[in-house]
């Protein structure tokens, strides 16, 4: 008996593993074009945050190239190997999530019971949904009884924990991929055609329930998409630069609400702002829509190109009846509502899915193995070059995590001392820039604080940068500049009370009675998005100042 007949995966043998040429596909060509466009964007808009983003892009490109070469040599063998790895990986995550739910292990987020190895239940749920869709598809495609047992047990474990993540976007992605899978099975296809009205009704009810479950969050995401589209249009074909999404978003949101306030009455007429949008807005840390995020940072052409790559890979995988098609569908839908491509696990998944989608057995242009290997070495050199700088950034992040203790204890002189040395490697970290800038403010170094905070506000949508810069101006007796900065902070996110209170205190310091009384009356009637003990404290402080005016 030959060795190749003993060592077998379902439907494959060692005969399938043989050197092959790599046939280039349209997916490969579009991927190269997209990489070149992102590289041009990186060169046109250089910054520290762009360095970080391009490192991620280089990682995905390298993973895609390596996977593409490996898969082209033996698609079936590599496919089953990766499905087996998926079983191990997702079962490990699911079991860890169950242990977190039952309290035997701690989650990675103090607000949520289960996160797996992730730091948030959203990505955790999305990861499980992607794995579940692949396992379910492989269960229906293969006839192996052994695989049915393995996949069936894995599916059961994942289904048990998935609802605990409360990831609506993950469940929506899973529903989309399972709907496509159902249409490939004749029995289910006939059922859907016969009872389409019932399927439609159930879909509408489920969609409405998902919306109402977290209505405020859903409204916020829709408003974010609206502002993102405006920002993408405003930045033209070249985009704003890699990693600049949040800074551009904050600017665009400010301009949007400023245009409404300008047609109102008085300095800040809150009634002129659309109330639903006022309560829906926030200062996001990520795009929560990967496609619009690419459009804002690299331009609409890059966004369309990326969508085309994903869709083409998806179609090719569906034609091949590959279970990875359903993983890609789930991931693609999940990316509309979340930020998977910021997370290494999803970056690797995306690279592998696209590599499978690009692999073809048919006719096509043949690339020599030497050219393919040279491409990998070139990308490897680029990755290594970026990785060196990334190591310095990672070291600085670790040092800063120790220094943050002093920030929490209000030992600002220690923060400033360490911040000076860490600044060159942490210009991409807006949290560091804010805390370092505020510490400089507390230490009376107002000009230096301004320069640090200005750098931070360019990569963040958080209005707190402008509040602290307003405090810098106030400390230097530049009242009009302080007023403009406080106003900007409020208009950026007009559901926060703090900037209005700073404005009121500014007018009180100036002795401007009329403007103080006007802004204090607005504070009395102001509805904040989140009412806390702190908002009540702020109202109490303004009421105490106001009492001095009414007692006169």
Model-derived features: positions:
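Transmembrane signal-anchor hairpin modules in multi-pass inner-membrane enzymes, especially those
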Residues: 1-88, 138-150, 179-197, 360-406, ...
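Alpha-helical transmembrane segments of multi-pass inner-membrane proteins
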Residues: 2-6, 28, 32-43, 51-69, ...
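Interfacial juxtamembrane loops and adjacent helix segments
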Residues: 105-111, 242-296
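Flexible juxtamembrane loops connecting transmembrane helices in multi-pass membrane enzymes
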Residues: 113-114, 177-178, 202-236, 240-243, ...
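Hydrophobic/aromatic packing residues within the alpha-helices of TPR/SEL1-like helical repeat arrays
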Residues: 412, 419-420, 453, 486, ...
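Conserved structural position within tetratricopeptide repeats
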Residues: 424, 454-458, 488-491, 525
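Alpha-solenoid helical repeat scaffolds
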Residues: 431-435, 464-468, 497-502, 532-537
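TPR/TPR-like (Sel1-like) alpha-helical repeat modules
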Residues: 488-491, 497, 501-531
């Amino acid at each position: 008996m030959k060795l190749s007949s003993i060592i077998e995966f379902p439907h494959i043998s060692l005969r399938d593993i043989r050197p092959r040429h790599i046939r280039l596909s349209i997916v490969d060509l579009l991927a190269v074009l997209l990489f070149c466009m992102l590289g041009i964007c990186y060169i046109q808009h250089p910054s520290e945050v762009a360095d970080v983003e391009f490192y991620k892009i280089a990682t995905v490109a390298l993973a895609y190239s390596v996977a593409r070469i490996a898969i082209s040599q033996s698609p079936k063998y590599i496919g089953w190997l990766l499905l087996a790895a998926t079983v191990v990986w997702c079962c490990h995550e699911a079991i860890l999530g169950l242990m977190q739910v039952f309290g035997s292990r701690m989650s990675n987020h103090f607000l949520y019971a289960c996160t797996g190895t992730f730091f948030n239940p959203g990505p955790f749920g999305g990861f499980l949904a992607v794995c579940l869709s692949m396992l379910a598809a492989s269960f229906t495609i293969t006839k192996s009884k052994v695989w049915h047992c393995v996949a069936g047990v894995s599916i059961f474990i994942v289904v048990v924990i998935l609802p605990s993540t409360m990831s609506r976007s993950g469940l929506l992605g899973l529903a989309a991929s399972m709907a496509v899978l159902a249409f490939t099975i004749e029995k289910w296809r006939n059922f859907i055609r016969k009872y389409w009205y019932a399927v439609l009704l159930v879909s509408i009810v489920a969609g409405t329930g998902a919306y109402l479950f977290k209505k405020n969050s859903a409204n916020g995401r829709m408003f974010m998409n609206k502002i993102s589209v405006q920002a993408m249009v405003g930045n033209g074909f070249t985009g704003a630069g890699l990693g600049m999404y949040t800074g551009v978003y904050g600017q665009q949101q400010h301009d949007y609400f400023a245009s409404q306030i300008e047609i109102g009455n008085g300095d800040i007429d809150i009634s002129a702002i659309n109330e639903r949008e006022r309560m829906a807005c926030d200062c996001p840390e990520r795009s929560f829509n990967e496609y619009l995020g690419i459009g804002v940072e690299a331009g609409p052409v890059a966004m369309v190109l990326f969508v085309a790559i994903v869709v083409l890979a998806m179609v090719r995988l569906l034609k091949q009846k590959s279970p990875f098609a359903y993983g890609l569908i789930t991931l693609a839908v999940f990316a509309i509502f979340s930020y998977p491509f910021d997370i290494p696990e999803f970056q690797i998944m995306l690279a592998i899915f696209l590599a499978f989608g690009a692999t073809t057995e048919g006719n096509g242009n043949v690339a020599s193995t030497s050219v393919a290997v040279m491409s990998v070495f070139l990308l490897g050199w680029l990755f290594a070059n970026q990785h060196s700088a990334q190591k310095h950034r990672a070291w600085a992040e670790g040092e800063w995590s120790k220094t943050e203790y002093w920030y929490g204890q209000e030992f600002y002189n220690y923060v400033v001392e360490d911040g000076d040395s860490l600044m060159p490697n942490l210009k991409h970290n807006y949290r560091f820039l804010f805390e370092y800038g505020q510490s400089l403010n507390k230490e009376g170094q107002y000009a230096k604080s301004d320069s640090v905070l200005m750098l931070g506000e360019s990569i963040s949508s958080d209005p707190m940068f402008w509040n602290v810069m307003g405090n810098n101006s106030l400390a230097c007796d530049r009242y009009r500049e302080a007023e403009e900065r406080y106003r900007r902070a409020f208009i950026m996110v007009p559901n926060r009370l703090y900037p209005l209170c700073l404005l009121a205190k500014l007018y009180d310091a100036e002795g401007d009675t009329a403007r103080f009384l006007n802004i204090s009356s607005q504070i009395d009637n102001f509805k904040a998005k989140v009412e806390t003990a702190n908002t009540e404290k702020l109202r109490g402080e303004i009421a105490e100042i106001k009492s001095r005016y009414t007692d006169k």
